[in-house]
Amino acid sequence: MSQLLQQLGTDNEFIRRHNGPASSQHQHMLNTVGAETLEKLIEETVPSSIRLPQPMQLPHGLSENAMLAELKQIAQQNTLNTSYIGQGYYNTHTPNVILRNVFENPGWYTAYTPYQPEISQGRLEALLNYQQMVMDLTGLDIANASLLDEATAAAEAMTLCKRGGKNKSSTFFVADDVHPQTLAVIKTRAKFIGFDVVVDTDSNLDSHDVFGALLQYPGTTGEVKDLTTLIEQAHAKKTLVVVATDLLASVLLKPVGEMGADIAIGSAQRFGVPMGYGGPHAAFMATREKLKRSMPGRVIGVSIDSKGNQALRMAMQTREQHIRREKATSNICTAQALLANMASFYAVYHGPEGLKTIARRVHHFTAIVAKSLQSAGFELAHQHFFDTLTVKTEQQTDILYTKALAASINLRKFDTELGISFDETTTVSDLVALLAVFGVDNAECDSLSNDIGQDEFAAIPEACRRTSSFLTHPVFNTHHSETQMLRYLKKLENKDFSLTHGMIPLGSCTMKLNAVAEMLPVTWPEFGGIHPFAPLNQAAGYTTLATSLKSMLCEITGYDDFSLQPNSGASGEYAGLIAIQRYHESRNEGHRNVCLIPSSAHGTNPATASMVSMKVVVVKCDDNGNIDMIDLAEKIAKHQENLSSIMITYPSTHGVYEEQVREVCDMVHDAGGQVYLDGANMNAQVGLTSPGFIGSDVSHLNLHKTFCIPHGGGGPGMGPIGVKSHLAPFLPGHSENGVQGSDYAVSAADLGSASILPISWAYIAMMGEMGLTEATKVAILNANYVMDRLRPHYPVLYRGTNGRIAHECIIDIRPLKEATGISEEDIAKRLMDFGFHAPTMSFPVAGTLMIEPTESEDLAELDRFCEAMIAIREEMNKVQQGEWPLDNNPLVNAPHTQVDLMSNEWDHPYTREVACFPSVQAKASKYWPTVNRVDNVYGDRNLICSCPSIDSYEE
């Protein structure tokens, strides 16, 4: 191709959109860090021993338009049949006001988990609404702010039963009418935690001695029955009872809490979130007051701020993996906040009466079809149901199933029965087409429907009918016009800080650009409208997408195979450690159960190791932040016979490329162990090195970090795992789609949160080999630039051999606190006044701040951040010198709100301008925190996890 034609082409044009600093600015930045060229900086930063010998074999980057055209062709390979499969997944209408203003809105999807509550009050309110919605519909005392999927929630509930119960048995009961994908995930969890699982009809529960039981209501085949007596019998034997339930069904059905259930779990998918071939969706868990401190997942609570005003926050964080490590209630980090928010907004928009209308409509459609089929001579497996029928079709099963497929209808197929599940998208014409498959005339259906319409509970037994009110809080009874809803959504969005406002420099979080072109395909119906258990030939587009993405990831990581099933980084860790343990078992070395973990590791690492019954042995780090090789050698020697693995992060969580990483891998391999390399910091590897090249056996990748899936304010995430060939046979399987051994599932669907995979595919396709490698280099340049600008003012805790850092740096606040009395929390809160989200606080070292600017931030934003940090350091000096008292200065009083600015009283030794407009940029474009500093201790001592009364909002 001629030079002119190359210039006229659009290959690689996206790179300059993704990377923040213009190439013309690189030299200024390099001068600041003291490097001649970008390549020279990389040579001084990344050890030569781990540099890739040749570039990745990936195509040139596509333009945005070319990528979207290619991805559209892939999407159109999917076939969108009308789905009646059910089994926990249903078509739904996403209200357009929510689609446009939340799902497609970077103000919602680019925010981070609300660890900084003062700049997160909007999504905290939305998540509190979600908890209230779940509590009301399940009839239980407290709910969390989402889990990964229904099957994972069931597995978490099983372990909660063991933690919170008094029965000494090690056996867990699962009713035989629980969704099969849920049972599969429970079996995986039980095996590696040491529990037995017994599957039987729920009527036989009383004959088993078990610590917990899982029932389904309605059952997977649709049956609705009163569980009260079964639960009472279980309680008599000190057995805790979990009930998997359906939120829409709970609008008409007696809540499981009123039947005595201890725990309720399920999925909020049908509240406005597309099926997406399996996800992402928000699962829920609700429980009794007595179990609240053992419940897994994030919980939003009501507290007060420093002025005594109501403020929301994440409550009871001492249960979580980032604090409790191997003693945590769960390894869950990222959950499904964005999808939980969408579900809560669905309930807010429709309100209780709107939900009743939808539920009645679904139930009446089901009842009409039931009567029509019975009048045509078909027998139903159950007479009581909400939205699902199981039809006894005997020898006609295959014929009718095939006939339905020919009519573009998907039914659920059993050996001699067919399942039919209805949802809010079902129409009268759908019913006519469905009944035609069974040979039922439309006129018959029409005459039968008159009787059914008179009865709200057409096929629900009296003992199972809901009589209690729900969603009585004003928030669910106000915003029912689109104008009202639009303004409510905007009001909440305006309270929160996201990437639309400025840099989010959270270390170990990689808050990079989530480009619009990457996000667009997520809303395409070809990706959103497919049921995860549809026949595989209807998901040809997803198969093509998954195969292509796995190939890309193998090339990037140096691994031989990938599973896309894990739907979070923590889930990926879990799947990876299971693969290691199954590998050892296959070699008759199942006794290997010791997992070495450096003291710098992320809290999910020890929490996950504990979930697979590993013994966690901590390896020390030296004064430079590297693994202490002497201590490592001693620990390996001590545990050689039982050594399973080591979990390392690279670059290390201390923000440096450890020179001896290959030696670490060799030492563990020589002792018979496997190397798990946590992919959290993959953003500093792509194109320069790779886990496989370094010597690792397995890694998870955080697609919501390195590969541009947005954080969504706390999820969704994706944690696919890559493995070397010897571990490939031990990747997760899935029973529904018959993949890879069909067992050891870690998620409810084979491709996990499949509908967000296009985001990462699009990013890689548009960046290509050159762009991905340049992004890594620019991430390193940006981090070193920030470090060198801040180093004269703040101690940098760890640097590599040549004084360089990887993609993030840790500044040490401890000596400054000793000198000034100002803490890392004070700095974090003061940054809000300057218009920034705080860096990561006190991780991986207490009393520090970890900063990761990513490659997407431009030079002006980097300088704005550095100038804010330098200004804060000058404010600390004023405190140290006595110009401002320690208990009354802009740092300890931060953040400052509009109420502070307009207050009639001002008893501070600094001006309102210093408080609220500390920089030129803050004056030009001010982000306002909506509450003062939140009181964490008060919130946990006075735990309230439901929507506050309307009176509490009044002045």
From Swiss-Prot:
Q: Name one Pfam family in it.
A: GcvP2_C
Quote the cellular component terms of the Gene Ontology held in the record.
Answer: cytosol; glycine cleavage complex
Q: Which reaction does it catalyse?
A: N(6)-[(R)-lipoyl]-L-lysyl-[glycine-cleavage complex H protein] + glycine + H(+) = N(6)-[(R)-S(8)-aminomethyldihydrolipoyl]-L-lysyl-[glycine-cleavage complex H protein] + CO2
- Give GO MF terms, alphabetically: glycine binding; glycine dehydrogenase (decarboxylating) activity; pyridoxal phosphate binding
Q: Which residues carry this modification: N6-(pyridoxal phosphate)lysine?
A: K705
Acetylation among keywords: no
Q: Which Gene3D superfamilies match?
A: Aspartate Aminotransferase, domain 1, Type I PLP-dependent aspartate aminotransferase-like (Major domain)
Q: What EC number(s) are associated with this protein in UniProt?
A: 1.4.4.2
Per its UniProt record, the required cofactor names are: pyridoxal 5'-phosphate
Q: Which UniProt keywords apply?
A: Oxidoreductase, Pyridoxal phosphate
Q: Record keywords: Oxidoreductase included? A: yes
**Please, one GO biological process term?**
glycine decarboxylation via glycine cleavage system
Fetch the PANTHER family from UniProt. GLYCINE DEHYDROGENASE (DECARBOXYLATING), GLYCINE DEHYDROGENASE, DECARBOXYLATING
Q: How does it assemble?
A: The glycine cleavage system is composed of four proteins: P, T, L and H.
Q: Which NCBIfam families match?
A: gcvP (TIGR00461)
Name the protein family.
Answer: Belongs to the GcvP family.
Function, please? The glycine cleavage system catalyzes the degradation of glycine. The P protein binds the alpha-amino group of glycine through its pyridoxal phosphate cofactor; CO(2) is released and the remaining methylamine moiety is then transferred to the lipoamide cofactor of the H protein.
Q: This chain belongs to which protein, by name?
A: Glycine dehydrogenase (decarboxylating)
